[in-house]
């Protein structure tokens, strides 16, 4: 089955929410089930605005810097709890997500009311997992306690957003990136077992009410517009999807998978045969290349064929699936965003004849 739908993983390098939604709606007129606000403004570089908030807090103090091996970025600030401060007593500021999404939803509602955004498309909110802004930002001895403390603040922010927005019109995506760095030993982390990661991801899924769809972006990072490592296959991503599906008390409605744009080897996609998500779980694969001019002709068709072959062997068997980019489009040059959006439509149109 060729791809039939499109997913946007979050950030889009355009001037603001309305520009993002209008460009997506005009350039990708079909296949969009959820509309991102582009994570514009202070959210443009994912969790960096959270780290900036932490650095200004009296409850923390500087502890040097931390290198990010494998990416072309300057050292990141490293923090620790200030003397006499316990993690459970940290006074977290307004994290900013609920306010941003409440504002963006008003734009979404207006554009859907006037027909720019099709009826039935949901407003998508993206949140980092609680681990993401904490692990790597704080010294290891403070991390566990701070993840629990920050989780309470992040979930409270999410609850405020959900309380202010109509559940029948929204969806939530959790961005699972730092966990993959921890599993793979990237960004200088010591590798951890999957069992250490799964409970936290299941908590994230279960935090979303049952009447709101929830998804997970399985991500290998985009710091400096590059992955912390090139995944060797879909094996680990499939393992994470299976583990979260089994551990969560509610269904996970979609997963988006990282596929490097040059990757066309059968072995990369073979682990899909072991996928144990249900038939109603939407699956999206990064077949929209950031650099289309450098991708050999026929790559997308080969990737699609491998996906179909191995999904056909999985527990739920052959099913419809969709496309996305490897991460968001926040690090893409603004002038290239329209081209990438057009490419989403082109891939759907090109493969439609095979449906």
Predicted regions: what they are:
Residues 1-72, 349-350:
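N-terminal basic, low-complexity leaders that serve as flexible interaction/assembly modules and, when applicable
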Residues 2-9, 31-35, 120-126, 169-173, ...:
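Structural preference for beta-strand elements that scaffold enzyme active sites
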């Amino acid at each position: 089955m060729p791809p039939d739908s499109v997913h946007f993983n979050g950030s889009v390098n355009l001037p603001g929410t309305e520009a993002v939604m209008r460009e997506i709606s005009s350039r990708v007129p079909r296949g969009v089930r959820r509309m991102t606000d582009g994570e514009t403004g202070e959210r443009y570089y994912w969790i960096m605005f959270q780290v900036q908030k932490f650095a200004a807090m009296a409850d923390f103090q500087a502890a040097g810097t931390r290198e990010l091996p494998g990416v072309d970025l300057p050292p990141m600030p490293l923090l620790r709890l200030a003397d006499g401060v316990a993690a459970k007593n940290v006074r977290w500021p307004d994290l900013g997500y609920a306010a941003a999404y409440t504002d963006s939803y008003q734009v979404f509602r207006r554009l859907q009311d006037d027909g720019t955004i099709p009826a039935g498309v949901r407003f998508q909110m993206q949140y980092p997992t609680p681990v993401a802004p904490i692990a790597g930002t704080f010294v290891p001895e403070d991390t566990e306690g701070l993840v629990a403390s920050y989780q309470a603040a992040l979930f409270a922010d999410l609850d405020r957003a959900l309380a202010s927005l109509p559940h029948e019109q929204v969806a939530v995506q959790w961005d699972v990136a730092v966990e993959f760095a921890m599993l793979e030993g990237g960004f200088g982390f010591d590798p951890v077992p999957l069992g250490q990661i799964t409970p936290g991801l299941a908590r994230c899924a279960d935090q979303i009410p049952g009447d709101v769809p929830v998804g997970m972006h399985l991500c290998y990072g985009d710091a400096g517009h590059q992955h912390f490592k090139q995944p060797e296959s879909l094996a680990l991503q499939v393992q994470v999807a299976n583990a979260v599906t089994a551990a969560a008390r509610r269904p996970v409605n979609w997963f988006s998978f990282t596929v490097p744009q040059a990757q066309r080897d059968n072995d990369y996609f073979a682990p899909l045969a072991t996928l144990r998500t249900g038939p109603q779980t939407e699956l999206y694969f990064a077949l929209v290349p950031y650099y289309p001019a450098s991708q050999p002709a026929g790559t997308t068709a080969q990737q699609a064929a491998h996906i179909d072959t191995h999904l056909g062997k999985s527990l739920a068997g052959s099913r419809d699936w969709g496309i996305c980019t490897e991460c968001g489009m926040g690090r893409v040059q603004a002038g290239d965003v329209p081209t990438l959006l057009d490419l989403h439509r082109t891939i759907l149109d090109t493969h439609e004849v095979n449906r």
